[in-house]
Swiss-Prot record:
HAMAP family: UPF0284. Pfam families: DBI_PRT. This is UPF0284 protein M1425_0030. GO terms for molecular function: nicotinate-nucleotide-dimethylbenzimidazole phosphoribosyltransferase activity. InterPro entries: Nict_dMeBzImd_PRibTrfase (IPR003200), Nict_dMeBzImd_PRibTrfase_arc (IPR002805), Nict_dMeBzImd_PRibTrfase_sf (IPR036087). It comes from the Archaea. Belongs to the UPF0284 family.
Length: 347
């Protein structure tokens, strides 16, 4: 049910944990054709806030239904909420820089929304704010927990992740995943190549140029935390791990990426080679959604969405606690059925 890579072990997860969801936006998501993490490019800026609201409340306030792809595939926040319902951990939403603010309690890192990486993603002032404040958050969480799981929500985050990995010297071109089964590699490559022109030499200034607020918030929280960390995400979390490694070469021994089988088996990406380059362990949930009653859920098995909002890590935590695949899928269907019954969501 859970596959282990590069020395990852599930036994470290048998303890109470807090779920941290870091949200933010990047104007890269406004580039047509780059991401399907929203029904239209403009709606992608609502996705992180709506994801956070749904995970905490079971409904969205910023938009009238959960985020969906242009073809109606539901957000992975649905999988996250279903998995966490069996465990009920403390859930904390952290705003690293979201254009739309969630209508729920959250911690603000005093960052800013990411701009177009082809010009300049973030100001140095906001980069420092995000890193310093997230390090402090991680330190405070260490007083109560030995384990935290960090998820992310930022449409177009795989593009900024690829730019970040390349800017830090990794072989990442065309290796990151996509929420679409048709990974828009040529468009991503064109955007990233333009972003990487005339890079500064200082690593922090490079991150300010081509990264995004969420990657910095995830990295900072991890750097401040003293215990074990499950980075719940796909190829984006390899970029977060690369940033962590840039600051502290010893930190990755306490960190594992927890993702989905749809990421590690993605034929149009190579997440495992990225993890190996960075030097971070990987766990993958082998959750099978083909038995779902809903086409929108079964679409995950066809390469749609794949990961996000901590879906893979949350499924791993539920499976570690003894929840069966069938039980988890029934819960996902139950939550999706409630949404279909109360809105114009397509099935």
């Amino acid at each position: 049910m859970i596959k282990e890579y590069y020395g990852a072990e599930t036994f470290i997860l048998n303890k109470d944990f807090a779920y941290i969801l870091v949200i933010g936006t990047t104007d890269v998501s406004l580039i047509p054709g780059l991401t399907i993490a929203g029904a239209t490019p403009e709606l992608t800026h609502f996705t992180p806030a709506a994801d956070a609201e749904y995970v905490l409340l079971g409904k969205c306030k910023s938009i009238n239904t959960i985020p969906v792809s242009p073809t109606g595939i539901p957000t992975p926040a649905l999988l996250t909420r279903a998995s966490l319902s069996f465990i009920n951990p403390l859930k904390i939403v952290v705003n690293a820089g979201s254009r739309i603010l969630p209508k729920i309690p959250y911690i603000d890192l005093q960052g800013e929304p990411g701009k177009d990486i082809r010009k300049q993603a973030l100001s140095m002032e906001k980069v420092n704010n995000i890193i310093e404040n997230s390090i402090k958050l991680g330190e405070e969480l260490s007083n109560e927990y030995e384990l935290i799981m960090i998820g992310e929500s930022i449409p177009a985050g795989t593009t900024t992740a690829m730019a970040t990995l390349l800017a830090l010297g990794y072989d990442a071109m065309d290796k990151v995943s996509s929420a679409s089964p048709d990974n828009p590699k040529e468009l991503k490559r064109k955007v990233v190549e333009e972003a990487l022109r005339n890079l500064p030499t200082d690593p922090l200034q490079r991150l300010a140029k081509v990264s995004d607020p969420v990657l910095l918030g995830v990295a900072g929280t991890s750097l401040g935390f003293k215990g074990k960390i499950l980075l719940a995400g796909g190829t984006q979390m390899t970029a977060a791990a690369a940033i962590i490694n840039e600051f502290d070469k010893n930190k990755l021994k306490d960190i594992t990426i927890g993702t989905t089988k749809w990421i590690v088996e993605d034929k149009f990406a190579d997440m495992l080679s990225l993890a190996k380059q960075v030097g971070v362990k990987v766990l993958a949930s082998m959750l099978d959604l083909s038995i779902s009653a809903y086409e929108g859920i079964r679409a995950y098995e066809k390469g749609y969405v794949k990961e996000g909002v901590g879906a893979g890590g949350s499924a791993i935590m539920a499976l570690v606690k003894g929840v069966s695949n069938n039980t988890l899928v029934r819960k996902i269907d139950e939550l999706y059925g409630e949404l279909v019954g109360s809105s114009n969501l397509h099935i």
